[in-house]
From Swiss-Prot:
Keywords: Amino-acid biosynthesis, Aromatic amino acid biosynthesis, Cytoplasm, Transferase. SUPFAM superfamilies: EPT/RTPC-like. Pathway: Metabolic intermediate biosynthesis; chorismate biosynthesis; chorismate from D-erythrose 4-phosphate and phosphoenolpyruvate: step 6/7. It comes from Xanthomonas euvesicatoria pv. vesicatoria (strain 85-10). This is 3-phosphoshikimate 1-carboxyvinyltransferase.
């Protein structure tokens, strides 16, 4: 059965309750496998996200000659080969749906002595890659894209890279990370300056693997020729996955949930600030640090939300959470205004258009703009939603269904497994009204 017939029926359930274990952070899982593969020695990764995207990244490193053991679904033991130990692949390297994987690998593979080809699924094959290949070319890399700048990426090895001081025109952690990874192999120093600070997972984790790197919000610098030391990584729960339960508990009356050991990277948690601005009741407990990443338990209680102007300064820190925020805005009283979010148009789908269209289908008034939208809160009706194969759109409308006056059918939800395997089971256990139909 094709993924297009795999859908959810979402309707009002009960108040959400319980202490929930959210799967591991996707961004941290990608990087943990990559850096452990490049390290000298053996690294153990606990809390690894067993999703399609991260499995694709692990499979790519296996094709590059790295031995990776899987003692359990959430564990990986990586036998690092060192920065100069990767082997030429015998076939194209399939990144699946993972934009993070493809863009970071472009920076890494540009510095190798062998040629390689990076391919992806239908969605990834439409995403812009010149934002990465451009600065890598400035460093001496040779990477070919399609004529429109999309994958596949043909990476020509054997190039001598040199460090650059790159002033990025886009606020993108993936672009920054690709340049920094190439910089590990480059002659001299490489620096990246961003228009707005982005997530610093790469910088924090490189430091955890023993790389000397200077970084502060919006800036990072390292010198080439360094080696990585194996280290064990405990991956925190993925904040972007937790976001759907944060919003659901905030809008479903009577709800109270605890989300355990959630990653709270300060460049990732703009949604918390936005929801608190709207009146959400979210507290942080049991602060700790895992692999350089701050974590805490999040306690979320239902609270009536009110519309707000979302500060543009928060946008880069919540770029993956906007589908969830749009549902919170639909449930709030008054208007919520989002600006400065044009980046949403080049994610796994055009998320601005997909969310605006979907909410209108459910009777919510949404005024779309080139870089955002105004959402008029009110009643959420029933209807059939097309997720466009986008995992975050699908999960957002599963939440919307919890306040529906009828039911919401969400089509094409198989891709949820890329970031949140078991979402439907966890949601049902917490109190969601959610049925899965037409499994593949």
């Amino acid at each position: 059965m094709s993924s297009s017939t795999h859908h959810w029926i979402a309707r009002r359930g009960t108040a959400l309750q319980g202490s929930l274990a959210i799967p591991g952070d996707k961004s941290v899982s990608h990087r943990a496998v990559m850096f452990a593969a490049l390290a000298d020695g053996v690294s153990q990764i606990d809390g690894f996200l067993e999703g399609e995207d991260t499995r694709s990244t692990a499979a790519i490193f296996a094709k590059l000659g790295v031995r990776i053991e899987t003692p359990s679904a959430s564990q990986r033991i990586v036998h690092g080969v060192g920065v100069d130990g990767l082997q030429p692949p015998t076939e194209a390297l399939d990144c699946g749906n993972a934009g993070t994987g493809m863009r970071l690998l472009a920076g890494l593979l540009a510095a190798q002595r062998f040629d390689s080809v990076l391919v992806g699924d239908e969605s990834l094959s439409k995403r812009p890659m010149r934002r990465v290949t451009g600065p890598l070319a400035q460093m001496g890399a040779r990477i070919e894209t399609q004529d429109d700048g999309t994958p596949p990426l043909h990476v020509h090895g054997g190039q001598a890279l040199h460090g650059i001081d790159f002033v990025s025109p886009v606020a993108s952690a993936q672009v920054k990370s690709a340049v920094l990874l190439a910089g590990l192999y480059a002659q001299g120093e490489t620096s990246v300056t961003e228009p707005h600070p982005t997530r610093d997972y790469t910088e924090r984790m490189l430091s955890a693997f023993g790389v000397e790197i200077d970084f502060s919000p919006g800036k990072a610098r390292l010198r080439g020729g360094q080696r990585l030391r194996a280290t064990d990584i405990a991956v925190p729960a993925d904040f972007s996955s937790a976001a759907f339960f944060i919003v659901a508990a905030s809008i479903v009356p009577g709800s109270e949930v605890v989300l355990r050991a959630v990653g709270l990277n300060p460049r990732r948690t703009g949604l918390l600030a936005a929801l608190r601005l709207m009146g959400a009741e979210i507290s942080e407990e049991n602060h700790a640090e895992h692999g350089g990443e701050p974590v805490a338990d999040l306690r979320v209680r239902y609270a009536p939300l009110r519309g707000a102007q979302i500060p543009e300064a928060l946008v880069p820190d919540m770029i993956d959470e906007f589908p969830a925020l749009f549902v919170a805005a639909a449930a709030a009283s008054g208007q919520t205004v989002v600006t400065g979010a044009a980046e949403l148009r080049v994610k796994e789908s055009d998320r601005l258009a997909a969310m605006a269209t979907g909410l209108r289908t459910l009777g919510v008034q949404v005024d779309e703009t080139p870089d955002g939208a105004t959402i008029h809160g009110g009643s959420i009706g029933s209807g059939v939603i097309e997720s466009h194969g986008d995992h975050r759109i699908a999960m957002a409308f599963a939440i919307a269904g919890q306040l529906s006056t009828g039911q919401v059918q969400v089509n094409d939800v198989a891709n949820v497994a890329t970031s949140f395997p078991g979402f439907d089971t966890l949601a049902q256990g917490a109190g969601f009204g959610l049925e899965t139909a037409g499994r593949r």
